[in-house]
Amino acid sequence: MKRAVSGFSSITAALKIASKVGFGNFYRSITSRNTCKTCALGMGGQKGGMTNEVSSFPEICKKSIQTQLTDIQQAIPESFFQDNTIADFKQITPRKLERLGRLNTPLYKKRESNQYIPISWNKALKKIFATLQTTDPERTFFYSSGRSSNEAAFLLQLFVRVYGTNNINNCSYYCHQASGVGLSATIGSGTATVVLEDLRQSDMIWVIGANPSSNHPRLLTELLRCRRRGGKVIIVNPIKEPGLVRFNVPSDWRSMLLGDNEIATDFVQPNIGGDIALFKGIAKVLIESGNIDMAFIEDHTSGYQGYAQDIMETSWTDIIKSSAIDRAQINHLADLYL
């Protein structure tokens, strides 16, 4: 795969968005002191926009630009809701819905109606208040967007606690609850243990079941830097995403002009759901070869003997069939890990 993604096309896309909302609004948005609403690789907070946590500049991505500028679009005219039914909304693509404008007035739908009706804030608050008054707080659950701002999330949880319950969560609950429980049970923390500074000192980075080129493009800068200092980037993904093979980083002139944009040193494509078998295979190679740090395991883990027994009882035939990765490639990955 020779063609790289992003680069000048991303810059062009950002400028198109800027032209719609005004270049003044665009500049104020990308240089403001805030955090990015799209992924955990933040915007530097009080260091200001386009400066990341370790003071690198310029650091920004088109997803961040799209999200921020969506918030400063022109308001959706009230007449739009009068002219369109809910059935009409179902025919509009998500992309067009996002580009309709900014929702700046409460909408109300009567049970028998097929339309949203714009109402005043006073009316909306009275309706909400009337419902809250007749509802037991312990029988309520407040669910918000993981893409809302930190300020909005703080105010919502504060309101919910004043109301009398702690039944609150956001869409990240569905995304990360399973992994959070699993991580808590195994490493003692439900969240990541890696920070940006760690990536900049890593000799090898494994990207497993993730698509940073689509969902958090700024991580690609760190992967590219790892390659340039002689490190390795191992991608484990059933889909061979172009952005994880070659990626033009818009803020990097070598990437943009010289084609220095290779990301993956190894791109491993197991069956969907075959990642467990793949990592069992890597572990089996390590155990069989005796390349295990038993002192570390005894000091910092529990249940190793049961784990090792399960690994050794799993046949190579089952591992290769389930993962769709041959023995030679599994041996190669184990050698890289060592």
Protein language model regions, located:
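Intrinsically disordered, low-structural-confidence terminal and linker regions
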Residues: M1-G42
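Cofactor-pocket helix-loop regions in the catalytic cores of large enzyme subunits
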Residues: M1-S9, G101-L338
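Iron-sulfur-cluster electron-transfer modules
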Residues: N25-G49, F57-Q157, G182
